Amino acid sequence: MSYRKAASARRDKAKTRSAGLTEEQKQEIREAFDLFDTDGSGTIDAKELKVAMRALGFEPKKEEIKKMIADIDKDGSGTIDFEEFLQMMTAKMGERDSREEIMKAFRLFDDDETGKISFKNLKRVAKELGENMTDEELQEMIDEADRDGDGEVNEEEFFRIMKKTSLF
C-alpha cells in the first residue's frame, strides 16, 4: 500500500469514528470530557466517566460503565483518553437518536395515550397501512413483544423488539 493510500485510509477511519455528529455535539462531548479531566492529564477514570455521561444526558448503570471501560480500555490503564471517549459517545449519541425515532413510532401506535400498544392499536395501524393481517397474526405480534405478560406492549418492550429487527 502506498503512503498516500495509507494516509487516506487513516483519515477516513478517523472521520468515521465521529461521523454523524454535528460540530456542536462534538464540542459538547469535548466540554464534558475536559470538565472531568480535572488534572489536565488528557484522561478520565471510571468514576469520572459516569459523571461525564450524566452531564451529556445519559443514565449509565454501573455494569454498563464497567463493560464500556473494558471494551475501550485495551491497555488496562483504567483510564480513557478523549479519542476513546469520543468514539464511545458517538455510538451512544446514535443510540439516543434511534431511541427517539423508535419512541416517535411508539406514539403513532399508542393513539389513545395509555403508554401501551394494545391489540386494538395494532389492528388500527395495520388497517391504516393497508396490511391485510388476521387477528391471529396481530395477536402473535403482540405476544412476541410482550415480555411482562400483560397482553400489551409497553415502551421498553417496543424498543427491544424494534432493536431486534435492526430497523433502527
From Swiss-Prot:
This is Caltractin. Coiled coil: none annotated. Ca(2+) 1 binds at residues 37, 39, 41, 43, 48. This calcium-binding protein is found in the basal body complexes (the functional homolog of the centrosome in animal cell). In mitotic cells it is specifically associated with the poles of the mitotic spindles at the sites of the duplicated basal body complexes. SMART domains: EFh. GO terms for molecular function: calcium ion binding. GO terms for cellular component: myosin II complex. GO terms for biological process: cell division. Keywords: Calcium, Cell cycle, Cell division, Metal-binding, Mitosis, Repeat. It holds the Pfam family EF-hand_7. Ca(2+) 3 binds at residues 146, 148, 150, 152, 157. InterPro entries: CALM/Myosin/TropC-like, EF-hand-dom_pair, EF_Hand_1_Ca_BS, EF_hand_dom, RNA-helicase_DEAD-box_CS. Residues 24-59, 60-95, 97-132, 133-168 form the EF-hand domain. Transmembrane segments: none annotated. Ca(2+) 2 binds at residues 73, 75, 77, 79, 84. Residues 1-25 are annotated as: Disordered. Belongs to the centrin family.
